[in-house]
C-alpha cells in the first residue's frame, strides 16, 4: 500500500519551473513524498517553445498536460483561458487525488488551479505569497491565492508580514527564501566558450540580456514602453551584444513578440530565444554585463550572480531591491542612461535579500511533518489589532 504523501506541483511557464525545479527534485527523491507534475500554459505551446520537453529532459514524469491557451491574448482571451483552466484542473485533481497542490507565484493559470483545489477540498501550498508587483494584475492574483491557501512559504520578512495582514495564521506562514537561489549553490554554470557554442552567439566586449513582458495594469500600452526600450538599445551602438528572450503569453504578449522578431531581423548584434532553459539562462545572466527589462529574474536571481539590473517601469514595483538594481521609467533616454550607469556598477559585494539558497530543505521539512493535511482545509481569519483614529 502506497502511504507516501502526494504533492501535485503545477507549472505553466519556463521561469516558474526554474524556481520550482529544486523542490520538485527533492520531493521526487524523498521517501515520504510522491511527486505529481501538472503542466499547463506556455509549456504546451509551440509558439512559446514547448518547454514541457525541458521538464521531461530533467527526468520528471508529467502526470497531466492541461492545455488552456487560446489564440487571443486580449483581456477577453485571457479571461476565457482562466475559465477553461478551472474546468480542466478540476478534472485533473479528481483523477490525481493529491494530498497537496503546490503553486508558486501569481500567474493567471495558477488562479484557476487554486480555485479548482479550493472547491475540491485539496490543501494548497503557496510559494512566494505576500510579494508585491504593483504593475500587473498578477498582484491581485497572488493575494487571492494566499486567501485560498493553507500553507504559505514566503521569500522574505516583508512578505511574511503581508500574508499575516491578509488574515493568515502565523503558524501557517514559513519564511524560506526564494527557491530559485537553491540552484546557485549546486548548479555548475556554463563557461563563456561552452555557452557561446550552445547559443551560437559570440559575446561582444559588452553584453546585455533583455526580457520584457507586458505590464497588465499600465494605462499606456506595453508596446509603447517596449518601443522606448528598443530605441534605447539602438542608441547604445552596434558594438553592444544583445540577447533577448521572448515575452510571456500575457495580454499584448504576441504584439511584443512581433515587434521583437522584426527588430532582431535587421540587427547583426542581436539574437532572440524563445526559451534558454534554466542552465543557459543563469549562465547568460552570470556572463553578461547587465540584465535589462521587467522580468522578476532581474530582481530575484541576478543579484546573486553579481550582475547589474536595469528594471524598467512598474511591473516589479513593490519588490525588495538589492543594490545592484537600477529602476527607470519606460522612456528612451532614461533607459539608455540607466544602462550606461549599470555598465559602471560594481556588484561584487551585493547581497541578495531573497535568501541563502537553502529554501528546498525548509519546504520539505514542513511538508513531511504536517499531520492530517485534510484538517488544514478549515481556516479561521487571524485578526490583527489595529488602532484607528
Model-predicted segments: where are they?
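Nucleotide-sugar donor-binding patch of glycosyltransferase catalytic domains
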Residues: 303-349
Amino acid at each position: 500500500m502506497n502511504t507516501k504523501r502526494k504533492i501535485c506541483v503545477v507549472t505553466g511557464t519556463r521561469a516558474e519551473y526554474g524556481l520550482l525545479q529544486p523542490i520538485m527534485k527533492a520531493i521526487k527523491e524523498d521517501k515520504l513524498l510522491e511527486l505529481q507534475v501538472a503542466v499547463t500554459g506556455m509549456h504546451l505551446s509551440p509558439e512559446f517553445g514547448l518547454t514541457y520537453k525541458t521538464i521531461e529532459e530533467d527526468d520528471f514524469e508529467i502526470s497531466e498536460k492541461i492545455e488552456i491557451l487560446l489564440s487571443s491574448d486580449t483581456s477577453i482571451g485571457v479571461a476565457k483561458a482562466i475559465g477553461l483552466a478551472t474546468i480542466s484542473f478540476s478534472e485533473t485533481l479528481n483523477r490525481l487525488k493529491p494530498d497537496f497542490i503546490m503553486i508558486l507565484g501569481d500567474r493567471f493559470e495558477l488562479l484557476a488551479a487554486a480555485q479548482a483545489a479550493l472547491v475540491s477540498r485539496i490543501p494548497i501550498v503557496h510559494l512566494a505569497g505576500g510579494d508585491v508587483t504593483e504593475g500587473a494584475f498578477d498582484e491581485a492574483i497572488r493575494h487571492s491565492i494566499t486567501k485560498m491557501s493553507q500553507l504559505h512559504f514566503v521569500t522574505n520578512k516583508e512578505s511574511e508580514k503581508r500574508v499575516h495582514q491578509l488574515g493568515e495564521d502565523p503558524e501557517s506562514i514559513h519564511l524560506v527564501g526564494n527557491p530559485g537561489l537553491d540552484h546557485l549553490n549546486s548548479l555548475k554554470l556554463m563557461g563563456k566558450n561552452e555557452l557561446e557554442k550552445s547559443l551560437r552567439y559570440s559575446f561582444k566586449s559588452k553584453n546585455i540580456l533583455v526580457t520584457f513582458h507586458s505590464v497588465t495594469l499600465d494605462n499606456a500600452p506595453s508596446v509603447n514602453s517596449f518601443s522606448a526600450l528598443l530605441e534605447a538599445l539602438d542608441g547604445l551602438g552596434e558594438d553592444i551584444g544583445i540577447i533577448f528572450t521572448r515575452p510571456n503569453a500575457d495580454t499584448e504578449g504576441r504584439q511584443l513578440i512581433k515587434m521583437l522578431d522584426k527588430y532582431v531581423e535587421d540587427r547583426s548584434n542581436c539574437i532572440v530565444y524563445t526559451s534558454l532553459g534554466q542552465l543557459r539562462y543563469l549562465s547568460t545572466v552570470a556572463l553578461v554585463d547587465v540584465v535589462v527589462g521587467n522580468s522578476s529574474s532581474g530582481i530575484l536571481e541576478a543579484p546573486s550572480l553579481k550582475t547589474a539590473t536595469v528594471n524598467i517601469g512598474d511591473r516589479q514595483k513593490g519588490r525588495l531591491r538589492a543594490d545592484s538594481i537600477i529602476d527607470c521609467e519606460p522612456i528612451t533616454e532614461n533607459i539608455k542612461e540607466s544602462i550606461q550607469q549599470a555598465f559602471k556598477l560594481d556588484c561584487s559585494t551585493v547581497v541578495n535579500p531573497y535568501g541563502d539558497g537553502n529554501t528546498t530543505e525548509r519546504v520539505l521539512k514542513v511538508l513531511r511533518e504536517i499531520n492530517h493535511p485534510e484538517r488544514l482545509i478549515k481556516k479561521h481569519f487571524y485578526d490583527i489589532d489595529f488602532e484607528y483614529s
